[in-house]
Amino acid sequence: MIFRYFVLLLLLCSTQLNAQEYSMGANFNPSTIAATPQKIALSFRSFAAMPASYSLEQYCPTPGNQGKHGTCVAFANGYSIATILYAKTHNITDKAIIDKYVFSPTFLYEQIKSANDTDCQFGSDPITAIGAMIDLGEVFMNKVPYACGTLLPNAAKIEAKNYKVKDAAVLFAAKGMSVDDVYYKEPTDMINVTKKALTEGTPISGGFRLPESFFKIQSAVWTSDPNEVNKDWKHNGHAMAIVGYDDNVGGGSFRILNSWGNQWADKGYVWMRYQDFTRYCTLALQVFADPNTMPPEEKKPSPTPTPQPNPKPEETTFSLSGNIEFKLNTGSDMTVNKISTRNLTVEEDVKGAKEDLVAYTMNGIYPSGTRFRFYMNIDQEAYVYAFATDLTGKVNLILPFADNVSTHVGSNSTIAFPSDTKVIQLDEQKGTDYLLILYAAQKLDAKDIVAKMNGMQGALSTKIKAVLGNKLIDKSKITYDSDKVGFSSKGHSTRNLTVVEDSKTATTGSVVPLMVEIKHN
């Protein structure tokens, strides 16, 4: 009896020591989650052609080790995600170069930790961390090495502004983590939105509440114990980067980059089966790269190379392209025709109309009560916004339809409006309605645009040009489709993404407007 008790005690101690061997440190806060927009729901179409596997591992740094500190959030988001985005933006796949430019978890943690967290044990909020990366930026680890309690030099804070991430949106949050569970998704949807975000070329910031078996992994694929329950350890929450997936590993698994060193599990990574992911992932956020980060020395051209390189090094550019499909609820197409417009009045293409915007008109006139929806297809990463006018000329914002919705979407995505299962119905007020959709390479203040448009006189096209000004990409640099509402615009410098409001500034802009005239009787 004494022997059996002794063995049981040894097993219990072994389990506790195993758990204590690795630190965590993610604190999930429903209030910061609620203040972060959720990525808009994509159409079913967006998930139809996803590959069986996808990986960002070629852009990952060597797995870091947080040691005994509660700094997993800084490692998952600063060390891992910021570095992956930087390497992908500048097409760096050489692991030695990636490790040279790995970002500092200390720089991030020291700015977001509690004031009384002197020994870096209290942990931090993943959303606060990502917000700091967006607003303040990051610096390389060779400038601010990993250590607790480091006093950050002002020079590092200044340099960090050159290395920001662009944006982030919540993909989902577990039950109880958002008001009325508005950010909750069913397990199948959790898997699909995570896979889709990865195929858009973005790593995912994952927050987890992990069971004991995760701390005892001895293989590349984690197999959880179905009978175990979460333990209330010092830091129940853990943050890790999600960097890929494979439908054929373990019945379908996500590739996870951890911060417990490269001796843990599969050289610092682990495959987490979809069923475990949906059970233990508490929060997932898609993080987007800022294309304007300063390139590494290895990618910079010499100041005055002789002879001149041929071809010359290209600066970072962005492209926008997409189209809109209108469908009756019967499934039939609502066809359109491109028009040259002066204040959205149809007229033939003539010389001297280059200053006008391009618009489309429906070929048919539809009766009141007609039900339809439209699909916005986004070929390259973009922010999308939609506005509609009524018969009084008032402009209404219809997308995003709520403050907690992000319309920043990645490549090869489709948004159905109002949704795949809902339709728009033309009301009894006969006449002409106008729809305006903006594709933008930078975030716009949609509410401010509406307020300014409604505060001025004139037709819709006049208001667009007055409000957006030099943010609009020049019409001569846009190729518009003639038989569908669509366009392409390529090769613009990312420097235009930060152009100031100055009518004298020469710029190609970063916004493409698509206007559609809908007549009904």
Task: Give the positions of each predicted feature.
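Sec-dependent N-terminal signal peptides
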Residues: 5-13
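Structured alpha-helical subdomains that flank or immediately precede key functional sites
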Residues: 19-101, 120-141, 205, 274
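Predominantly the structural core of cysteine protease catalytic domains
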Residues: 23-24, 78, 82, 112-257, ...
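Conserved beta-strand/loop element in small beta-rich adapter and peptidoglycan-binding domains
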Residues: 72, 237-243, 369-374
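Short, solvent-exposed loop/turn and secondary-structure capping segments
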Residues: 83-94, 143-145, 217-220, 253-255, ...
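Short, conserved phosphate-binding/catalytic loop or strand-edge motifs used
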Residues: 103-111
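Secretory-pathway glycoprotein ectodomains that are cysteine- and/or Ser/Thr/Pro-rich
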Residues: 290-521
